[in-house]
Amino acid sequence: MLLKDKVAVITGGAGLNGLGFATARMMAANGARVFILDLAVAKPEVAAAQLGPQHVGLVANVTDKASCEAAVAQIKQLAGRIDILVNNAGITQPRKTLDITGDDYDAVLDVSLRGTMYASQAVLPLMIAQNGGSIVCISSVSAQRGGGILGGPHYSAAKAGVLGLARAMAREYGGNNIRVNCVTPGLIATDINKGKIPDDKRQAILDGIPLGRIGEPADVAGCVVFLASDLSKYCTGVTLDVNGGMLIH
C-alpha cells in the first residue's frame, strides 16, 4: 500500500461528495490513518467514521490559526506524527468583478488562501522535527486560465495565491525533506456545482474537454495520493493539472 502507516490530515474533508472525502477514502484504502478537519456543521466525525474506527474527524476552522494549532496538537497526541497535509478547504462564489464586495473577497480568500497558510503553519513544525513530510494544496484551473465555470475573479485570485504560496514553501522547506505540491482540478462533479450548470452550457464545456467528460472526485484523489506518496519523492513545487485537457499549456 502506497501510504502504509502514514498519518494524513485533510482540511475541508467532510463533504461526502467532495474532493476532500474522496481523497480521505483513497488514502485510507492505501494504508494511511486519516484525520478529517472541518467545521462542526459539516460533521467531520461522521465522515471519518465511514472510513473505519482508526480514522478521526476533528472540528477545526482553517481561518482561525489557533483552531488549526489546537487540531494539530490533538493529532500529535493521538498519532504522534503527521506525514501528509492536504490543504483542501475552500469556498467559491459566482460573482462578477464589479459585484464582489469586501465581505465576498474576505470570505473566499480567508478559506482558500489564509486557510492554506494557517494549516501549513500548524503542521510544519512537526514535519520539520520529523525531517520529512508532504503537503498537497488544492488550487484550481481557474487560477491558470483566468476564471472558472462558476467561481468569480476573487476565487481565481485565491487559488492563484495558493499556487504561489505552495511554490514558496517548497523552496523554503526542501532542505527539511518536506515536499509541497499543488493539484489544479478542472470541472469536477461535486455538490458545489451540482444542478448549477444548464444543459446547453454543460455541453459547451464538454466540447472543450478532450477527454470528453466531467471529472470525478476520485480523479483528483488519485493525483493527490500520488503527490503524497513516495512515488513522487523527487517532486516538489509541482503543479499537477487534473482537467481532462480543458487547459493544455
Regions found by a protein language model. Name each.
Residues 96-97, 104-109, 193, 205:
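Substrate-binding pocket helix/loop in short-chain dehydrogenase/reductase
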Residues 120, 158, 166:
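Active-site helix of classical SDR
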Residues 125, 167, 171-175, 233:
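Alpha-helical segment proximal to the catalytic Tyr-Lys
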Residues 140:
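Residue(s) in the substrate-gating loop at a strand-loop-helix junction
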Residues 225, 236-249:
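Short C-terminal tail/terminal secondary-structure segment
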